[in-house]
């Protein structure tokens, strides 16, 4: 059994579970081993939704073409819904939002897990009038496990000592054909949401035994000290 760390009280310090950028970069890369189905036809979307509706839990994510100019904006290009074994990549920049996908996103009886999904919802509501139901945002969920980090890659690194590469994040998600690297990146992000949620619920996570649970500088303390001297 891992040893539970004893917290000490040090002025200007705070205990939290967090992984540094340097530590994360040194972890071995995670890879995707499931099936990937790219949906770029309306008929294929209907078939995919029939499979997805059989599941009790789905991983959710989206990808958007990056912007490099001030004032430039792109709508969501790719919407990922993952089961435990396969991920469906809906190219909504090509086929629009299929009604069957919208129905799943608005079904409170199908649990969907994502990370930092507020902005996704705003964009999808603006374009497709989405009213999301049945979602859990890991960004808020992990706080009850004393995990201070809120990005998917850092949460995954803390729990599994594996690194999810973000190398494809700024690639062109509106390209005519998605590369294999893009597909695997998108699929892994969605699957990782399920993996994290189920690990926390089924296996449990005692942050007091984590090697990433330790003292960090308390920014509130530092600010208070500065205010005292001014």
Give the label of every model feature segment.
Residues 33-46, 53-60, 66-188, 192-199:
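Conserved DEDDh/DEDDy metal-dependent 3′-5′ exonuclease domain
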Residues 1-58, 138, 191, 205-230:
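N-terminal accessory regions of nucleic-acid-interacting proteins
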